[in-house]
Amino acid sequence: MILERVEIVGFRGINRLSLMLEQNNVLIGENAWGKSSLLDALTLLLSPESDLYHFERDDFWFPPGDINGREHHLHIILTFRESLPGRHRVRRYRPLEACWTPCTDGYHRIFYRLEGESAEDGSVMTLRSFLDKDGHPIDVEDINDQARHLVRLMPVLRLRDARFMRRIRNGTVPNVPNVEVTARQLDFLARELSSHPQNLSDGQIRQGLSAMVQLLEHYFSEQGAGQARYRLMRRRASNEQRSWRYLDIINRMIDRPGGRSYRVILLGLFATLLQAKGTLRLDKDARPLLLIEDPETRLHPIMLSVAWHLLNLLPLQRIATTNSGELLSLTPVEHVCRLVRESSRVAAWRLGPSGLSTEDSRRISFHIRFNRPSSLFARCWLLVEGETETWVINELARQCGHHFDAEGIKVIEFAQSGLKPLVKFARRMGIEWHVLVDGDEAGKKYAATVRSLLNNDREAEREHLTALPALDMEHFMYRQGFSDVFHRMAQIPENVPMNLRKIISKAIHRSSKPDLAIEVAMEAGRRGVDSVPTLLKKMFSRVLWLARGRAD
């Protein structure tokens, strides 16, 4: 069973959100998208540590800066879906038999709704119900009992949770570590792995597993948290760097075909570590939903890679939040979800499992995920043909006083990956985009591609396309008053009669395209803003307008 959708209306910092989830989810967004409110909602409503949650006055949304405009109603709908058609009949789901709803796609789902009503006297009422596929309440004998069973089966575990940290620091975590069970499980996993040694000795396997425990502990306790914190690690590995390398090899052993039994052992180890920390007891049928907040915290990129691989081996649904381009480079783009706060809602953008063709997905993975993962955080992409434009545009924008990084604008060359996959991807992910093309034959084809994507809408074309009235950026800048730079770089006097193309070719030959582009941009800087071509100034204004949400 997985949590398939979360719908929130009027809870804390979220006015309205509809978020589709899959087995693996990495959420990104700017600071104000409502991360804490979403994670709090899941943590409070599906917490295995306490009884069913009752809404409070502070849970109701209010417009920013207007606390007196606080809403009096909120509701949250959690949609759970069986992992495969027919799985709802297995033993552990039988107590929820009355709550399952058959749907047209062949799957059964549970629609669990929670509502909060705030009265004038400050009192708050919490209502629970299970819905059918049309949104009507199902007549269930004991709703609270069913809700408790649902939470027992799919509790939320919030890694690096601040409330848990505070309990550790306050010394209120029960000091009942189950060290012996953990040691036995580690020994068993070590024995299992040593039967397929992959060139690792028993000692190396144990060092790697020691690093595994250390890593899992990293997410449940804070360094130097005082005496109340009981470490399962008896001692640090003598060579920590080597231990991490062994853990990486163990990860790969577990990840290969036939490694399912190892994953089950790993899950048992994970559960034991949780219980050894004294935080909670999980039901034997529980399949927790992991909430992982910013897993890059205090981890070197190499260790983050090993850690992320280990977390991905746990056979559990995961929702992670991150601000790390490094972590995005380790994540298939299909798992990434961008959340953007709009005036009336928080919009969720993701490709989903059938978002791009195999070929387009491969190109995006190489061009964006591996080489420019931080561009997924951008508000707007300015797509240019090649390296020359990248240098010139970034530098000329800076000369005009525009700081693209601070505005969330990324200049990305598209010649290598193709224009259409990038535009399709940007649209699906809610990233604004604008294309700058040359005036040659290739540029005209790119412009035609943009027009076809915009259904030949002239208004939309003005927002998304700028075409240079010259063969390329070099010819354009030559004609815009920078001919002396080209002559200087080509070492040709200005009064020598020579074909324009030859002058540019010699200038490139005696330096390089990027060097020539930088020299032109630097010359523009010396001359001042007035020397920047009007066409490019207009394009900068348009791109800034797109990045700012078309607000100005």
UniProtKB/Swiss-Prot annotation:
Q: Which residues bind ATP?
A: G29, E30, N31, A32, W33, G34, K35, S36
Xref: PROSITE patterns: TOPRIM (PS50880)
Task: Write down the species.
Answer: Escherichia coli (strain K12)
Segments forming domain Toprim:
379-469
Q: What gene, per UniProt, encodes this protein?
A: ybjD
Out of the domains of life, which is the source? Answer: Bacteria
Q: What is this protein called?
A: Uncharacterized protein YbjD
Biological process (GO) annotations held by this record are:
DNA synthesis involved in DNA repair; double-strand break repair
Keywords carried by this UniProt record:
ATP-binding, Nucleotide-binding
The record's annotation in PANTHER family points to: DNA REPLICATION AND REPAIR PROTEIN RECF, HOMOLOGY WITH RECF PROTEIN
The GO molecular function terms of this record are:
ATP binding
Q: Which Pfam families match?
A: DUF2813, OLD-like_TOPRIM
What InterPro entries has UniProt attached to this entry?
Answer: DUF2813, P-loop_NTPase, TOPRIM_dom, TOPRIM_OLD
